[in-house]
């Protein structure tokens, strides 16, 4: 379990204060939830990114708040793509024995046999709803697609669960399918079409008629 230090923010801060805070490499955040009151804090952006890379989006973090250490998860965060900057974080204090339902990313593993034969792998479902205690929430759910032929598919019910969690999605929801290759014209057909285009006569414009039309427009 990763640790992250925070500093309590005192008083009401203006937009200018928050801008200055972010420019100094800190991120304004709030802590709320189980066993704690709403507390405004700030954390180091670089350290926060390191922690998320270590524990994952749904990982548990030991957050230092004043003299206390609170077990939290990242409930939400905002990111400014123009400035490439995290602008705000919501830390949710949690009860480690209480189940939570969160979104977990689906990770496809292997190369489908059908894809090697020209088929196209389509993935309509990128995340799954998972219920578990915080320590049992998987970082990702791997789905092996290496045996899939063209026209084969895998649904939620086909997932082999290796952990103490429950998937809440409809068992019939499709996760991945291999569709047949699209029909593309052969090289001969492409050359024939190009030849037809090259031999087409361009439309001849009557210059006198064109001039008359221009005069009529001016009138």
Swiss-Prot record:
SUPFAM superfamilies: Ribosomal protein L25-like. GO terms for biological process: translation. One of its GO terms (cellular component) is cytosolic large ribosomal subunit. Gene3D superfamilies: Ribosomal protein L25, beta domain, Ribosomal Protein L25, Chain P. The keyword Ligase does not apply. It comes from the Bacteria. This is one of the proteins that binds to the 5S RNA in the ribosome where it forms part of the central protuberance. This is Large ribosomal subunit protein bL25. It comes from Staphylococcus epidermidis (strain ATCC 12228 / FDA PCI 1200). The lineage of its organism: Bacteria, Bacillati, Bacillota, Bacilli, Bacillales. The gene is rplY.
């Amino acid at each position: 379990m990763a640790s992250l230090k925070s500093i309590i923010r005192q008083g009401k801060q203006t937009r200018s204060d928050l801008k200055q805070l972010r420019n100094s490499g800190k991120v304004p955040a709030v802590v709320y939830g189980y066993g704690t009151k709403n507390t405004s804090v700030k954390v180091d952006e670089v350290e926060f990114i390191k922690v998320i890379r270590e524990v994952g989006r749904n990982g548990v973090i030991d957050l230092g708040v004043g003299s206390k250490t609170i077990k939290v998860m990242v409930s939400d965060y905002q990111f400014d793509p123009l400035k490439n900057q995290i602008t705000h974080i919501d830390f949710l204090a949690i009860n480690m024995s209480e189940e939570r339902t969160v979104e977990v990313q689906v990770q496809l593993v292997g190369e489908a046999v059908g894809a090697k034969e020209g088929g196209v792998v389509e993935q309509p479902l990128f995340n799954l709803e998972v219920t578990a205690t915080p320590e049992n929430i998987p970082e990702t759910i791997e789905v092996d697609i290496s045996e899939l032929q063209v026209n084969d598919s895998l649904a939620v019910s086909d997932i082999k669960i290796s952990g103490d969690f429950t998937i809440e999605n409809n068992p019939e929801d499709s996760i991945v399918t291999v569709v047949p290759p699209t029909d593309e014209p052969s090289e001969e057909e492409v050359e024939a079409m190009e030849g037809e285009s090259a031999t087409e006569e361009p439309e001849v414009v009557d210059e006198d008629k064109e001039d008359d039309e221009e005069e009529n427009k001016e009138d």
